Amino acid sequence: MAGSYGVMADDGSIDYTVHEAWNEATNVYLIVILVSFGLFMYAKRNKRKIMRIFSVPPTEGMLSEPSFYDTVSRIRLRQQVEAHPVSRKYEYQQPQSQADSVQLSLE
């Protein structure tokens, strides 16, 4: 039976080369699966670190543009600065008199 691909060799003993190859292949697959699972768990725990690696740093044009919250706070500050003299002007124009107060009398 020369050249046969059976499990039995010519002398009647079992040929283990197929089994050894299968065992080696399954060991490799098992290692690949375990390493993949470990990498998945690491990525799940350290998502922010990994995303920081792949994020593009801001360009020069982005640095000159202020953020939305900075713009809003500056607008609000400017509005307060503009409104302050107006309120002071109104306070100085109104004489401090008793006409603004209400007096109650009991009868």
Swiss-Prot record:
InterPro entries reported for this sequence: SMIM19
Subcellular location, in the record's words?
Answer: Membrane
Q: Please give, as recorded in its UniProt entry, the membrane topology of this protein.
A: Single-pass membrane protein
Keyword vocabulary terms for this entry: Membrane, Transmembrane, Transmembrane helix
Q: Which residues cross the membrane?
A: 25-43
Composition bias, Polar residues = 93-107
Q: Which GO terms describe its cellular component?
A: membrane
Q: Where is this region: Disordered?
A: 88-107
Transmembrane recorded as keyword: yes
Q: A Pfam family in this protein? A: UPF0697
The answer to whether UniProt assigns keyword Transmembrane to this entry is yes
The family annotation for this protein states: Belongs to the SMIM19 family.
Protein name (Swiss-Prot/TrEMBL): Small integral membrane protein 19
> Coding gene?
Smim19
